[in-house]
């Protein structure tokens, strides 16, 4: 790997169309006015969030004078960002937040440049790849040290081309508290074995974590998850239309859960919920539409479960 210096030169490629394009997030620009010089196709420009890019490929060079401590919103809604190879030279060792770093980068397909990033001090990964709708695999993240991560919410929300999450297999998420909407809308994701040994014991918010994962049919990898600290399970598996068997959740400790609204709503393949009878939901307050539009379930089955739960 090339040596990372105090001053970094980062080359990026954007695909322009002779119109005003957003290439950086406003918050990132405001915070780095004095730290970054910008060159577009070789010409120095003022650092702002929008530019009129010529039709075709445009070269954007960033000259970063000092180590960045906050990459939040750096490429927020940069829909024409095509190539980030230059980011492999970016020194991230001081960074604590990657919130919405690539949010809405819908043309981004390759994140190999990030594989050697030092993320050991990052606590906030919220929405980092949200809306990266062309991203199909994240193997490049397999060696990331995310042990200090606390917020993983919305991290891959809307990554509708994502089919392979093996890069997350060895992640240490033991400090993670927020996992809400982490994979929401990953409609092609069918294999979540990479999550089998995740330590989510510190997690309290699982709302909509797998919402609209319409290809997900096997949740056995979640069988041994310790969700005892979880209080919000609202919509966690809502619209998982291929999910027929929730037996793996039989021994989940949800005794601290207070929100179960829409948890399995529109799971149109779901046929059996008897295994949930062992759940302790004594602290639950919201159960509205928990199984709404589960067309293969009978009302009598749902009523029987609720009677067992005494709600």
Where are these regions (language model features)?
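Negatively charged
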Residues: 1-311
